[in-house]
């Protein structure tokens, strides 16, 4: 850890002198590091995965040596405690207990969450705070005007991290389909991710946000024009149990380029790429294929009254398909809480040559009663022939302009092939339905 901290100090020194000049020591500095895809597969689905979100989080937390930083919308890891064990509530209990155990062995644990509400109370984080764990809440509406802190972020020892769709919720481990990226032993990239966490952590004490200048302490180390170059081992497909996953992955060290993007614009510190800019770059740079999995998609706002039109992403997808003959495939979630404004836009997209849209429908659990706000594909990712985008945001204006979120953007052929295999697995699964069905 002394080496990791020294490395981060060196990187920050070079960046603060000139954020466009990155020390040569940052290149290949993740020797021995790994990158993996972690998934939650709802119980009862006939889909296999190499690494579950539960196992990834347990590995990160139980192996922490010095620090654990957690940034989440809310915490309901114990929410399944009173349910029949068949629902999988124990998975959330495991994570909660691992956090408590880490604190008890002297690990510095920090939690930042959205301001609690009646819908998302802070019962569990109050319990953790009483044990001595540091907990802060961001009054997001006061700082931004609307929206929430919607991020899902774990940082361990300033050298390992998780970014993805899974909430700190037992159902995100057992009853909801999720996907995220796990980085281990990669202080280069995690140093940059830690900057985003520090923004959240300190913003909890702000009465207003900095206007156009977060200061040099928050300058991004990398962005979409100056990416981190990393030597990482990707063993996602070792011992692959899914017969539908046709990529066998070598598990050898390869060079990766990668950067972190953030939303909303109010949290874009100097040199930081905006999440919407990263997403748009991926679409606009695709020459052959764009495959998208996201829970909600609409070229509008989703939470305003009235909602307003925002065709930025929609126009880019249509242009890619029509002007460049890019093959676009979209898997959008349909569940009990799908907004009634969403289907019309998907039906329209599906009429465009080279665009195919399908619903992904997670069937009800085999045991009653059914648990509200579960049984849905909550993953948020895009893969093109060139890159992978894995984020925390749904695709409507609100998530990019007023809501707190992150994305990891990865450039590596093997990793892209693996994410593409996951998309293909889901696209060809029995859980998709024609867009015309709803």
Swiss-Prot record:
Residue numbers annotated as active site: 150, 152, 157
S-S bridge residues: none
Keyword annotations from UniProtKB, A to Z: Glycoprotein, Hydrolase, Lipid degradation, Lipid metabolism, Repeat, Signal
PLD phosphodiesterase domain: residues covered: 145-172, 373-399
InterPro entries linked to this entry: Diverse_PLD-related (IPR050874), PLDc_3 (IPR032803), PLipase_D/transphosphatidylase (IPR001736)
EC number: 3.1.4.4
GO biological process, one term: lipid catabolic process
The keyword Nucleus is assigned to this record: no
Organism superkingdom: Eukaryota
Carbohydrate-modified residues: 50, 223, 336, 394
A GO molecular-function annotation: phospholipase D activity
Catalytic reaction(s) noted: a 1,2-diacyl-sn-glycero-3-phosphocholine + H2O = a 1,2-diacyl-sn-glycero-3-phosphate + choline + H(+)
Family: Belongs to the phospholipase D family.
Protein name: Phospholipase D Y
Lineage: Eukaryota, Amoebozoa, Evosea, Eumycetozoa, Dictyostelia
